[in-house]
Amino acid sequence: LDHVSESIEAGMTWHSVIEKSERYIRRHGGNPAFPCTLSVNNIAAHFTTDHTLTPPEGVEEMVLQKGDLVKLDIGVHVKGAIADNAITIEIGNGGNHTDQIRAAKEARDASIEKMHPGTPWHEVGAAAEQVAIDAGFQPIRNLSGHQLEKFNLHAGVSVPSHDCGPNHPGYRGVVPSGGIFAVEPFNTTGSSGMVENMS
């Protein structure tokens, strides 16, 4: 993740970053656990040029520009053992998105700090939400982290990034002992805290 993110710069195509990421994984003995995704600016997550070379709605061309907010999400598996990692960067490090990037990292850390066996999931989400709100952002409520198991990227348990309450059907129960999780809090400058186009 660091190798690729440190080499991203203005003028690169979205597709070239994705190809570079997947080549690096294979060159080092792994395989992509899912198509590498590169989501730019108001695209919150899960966009990959592996599915299309047609720009998404509102994007003229898929070339990185100085000041773009880029979310790079890479999954690796080695003999079925999966790692799911993401990083958010600003192209050119102009400081336009520093607070938002910091808030996402701090929300992740706050969630991890809460994740002890027996902790209700809604308390994990509440910790992430509080960090986002204190920093002036909204958590994205319909994107979440997830459990990882061998050969299973989404293993049934979701990790909330907002205070969903103790009775939310998607986040009932408590943090189990021995689980492996991708903790993925998303935040937004928008008011709804929801991703509107999930296609």
Q: What is the predicted function of each stretch?
A:
Residues 1-199:
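Active-site neighborhoods and metal-handling regions in enzymes and metal-associated proteins
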